[in-house]
Amino acid sequence: MVLKQAASAIALLLMSSIAIAQQPPDAVRVRGTIESKDHQLLNVKGRDGEILKVKLANDAPIRAVVKVPLSDVKTGSFVGITAMPQPDGTQKAVEIHIFPEAMRGTGEGHRSWDLMPTSTMTNATVTTQVASNNGNTLVLKYKDGEKTFQVPPNVTVVTYAPAAPTELRPGVKVFTAAAKKLPDGTLEATNITVGRNGINPPM
């Protein structure tokens, strides 16, 4: 039974990584709090206060983010870092999400990101770690480049875990990077991330 549950969890995370990697270029990102739920339809209050209708696609993977310590980031870890570009060419980490091994390679690369003005997202492998009193320095390498990150001691660090549909309930904060706008204005999500234990998905 335990092995079967573990296999199911790995399969779910693999489905999630495939869905992220295959998101269309016009995908809409949704960040907000669930106001109500009606089967597959979620009413989500966005950061600007607008109520968004988010419909989960059939078999859309649901995953949770859970807080972990910065020490869980290891050399060789595949991570995503939201960051702000610095004048010296480095990036200052705003948050770090550690991908499980089953999701290695998800969205690999460096790109602009809409969490904050001028913020970036880098999904890559940690190749170097240097600790100091003011925080850590991480070097991340992806297929066609690398970036250096300054990591404050209090940075938010999370990882992913499979989640049940029952975790999608009013008051819970959610995020999806892969929603498609339908003709009626509804957003169809091919995957969704829920903040477990009151966490706001930081990406």
Where are the model-predicted features located?
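Positively charged n-region of N-terminal signal peptides that target proteins for export
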Residues: 1-5
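Bacterial N-terminal signal peptides
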Residues: 8-17
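Short, flexible, surface-exposed loop segments at domain boundaries
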Residues: 19-203
